[in-house]
Each structure stands twice: as structure tokens, then as C-alpha cells.
Amino acid sequence: MPLKIKNIDFLFENSVTKIVANRNHPEIKLAGLTIGPFQEGNEYEVYFWAAQELAAAGIAHFREENCLAATDIYKVQWKERVQIAGQISELPEDFYPKLRRYLANTKEEIATHPEKVREHEKAVHLACDIVNARLKKIITLSSGPTQTDQVLKKFTSEERLIYEQLGRIITEWRAQILEYDNKGE
């Protein structure tokens, strides 16, 4: 991943998310950070990276609305497909970081649940469809006039990054193509 997307991912890892405690657990002290104590069934807000560790240890689980599911990916792909040409839909918050983690998790699950191969392959296919459809729209939008805030607000941070980079490249290329200097003759 390019450095900028890694930065966006870092921000996601350090954002606060909601979890639900699976069991009672005393507080956990880390260098400069205390998490918990946890009481079974109660909801807590913790950093995403801490939530992952708590989930892996079986202490807590993510709230359903904080995770991406196969149905969410299908809905996004369908929404992108039915958009009018030149229109781009708004993605759910933190869609790409959640998508990357969903794909990584389904890939890991294959080791212990081989029947999940099909689910993973379908998710990868849908993810590629989404990325390709949105990328085509972003390329078209970046090669035209500057877009309004109404259009730009529908971009994720990752998409705004590629939109801005493409816009600069296309503007520079266009200027070079149309520039004529006969002083060299």
C-alpha cells in the first residue's frame, strides 16, 4: 500500500469503536493506557486495534454495525452498478479499511473452515467490481473540470487521494501537450 493509504489505515486503527463484553474481565493496563474493567453484556468504546485484540482473546466482540458483512459488500456493489453514468454513490464510513479487514479475515478462516473458500472468492470478486467501477468514475471526474464539494464529499479519503493525484498528472500532461516552444529550432 502506498504510504498515504497506510496513514489512512493507521488513523482507522487508532479510531474509537464500540465493543460488547463477552465476559467479566479486570482492567488491562498497557503503557500509558488502561482498558476496562469489563462486565459481560456491557458496551464499551475502545481503540480499534485494542478491540481486535479483545475480540481475538474472546473477551469482547465488535458490535454488528461496526463490521462489514458479505451483504454490505453486495449492497455497495449493487448500488455502484445501478448509478447513472458519471454519478458516484457515497460509501459507508471507513468502507475500505473495513473491506481490507473483512477480506483478510475470510482468507484466514479458510485454514480452519475450507468451506469458506467460495465466500472469500465471492467477496474478492465483489470488492474488485466496486473498486474498478469507482476507479473508472474517479478517472473520468479527475480529467474534467474541478468537481463541486457535493461530488467530492462522496469520495472516501483513499479515493480523494487518487482523485487529487490524477488531477495533477492530467493537468500537467494537458499543459505539456498543448505547449509549443519553437525556440529550439
Regions found by a protein language model. Give the residues of each.
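N-terminal, Lys/Arg-enriched amphipathic/low-complexity engagement segments
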Residues: 1-27
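Phenylalanine-focused residue identity feature
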Residues: 10-12, 38, 48, 62, ...
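Charge/polar-rich, low-complexity and marginally structured segments
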Residues: 2-9, 67-185
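Short N-terminal secondary-structure initiator segments
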Residues: 13-15, 40-41, 47, 84-88
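General secondary-structure edge motif
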Residues: 18, 33-35, 79, 107
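Compact, well-ordered interaction domains used in eukaryotic information-processing assemblies
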Residues: 26-68
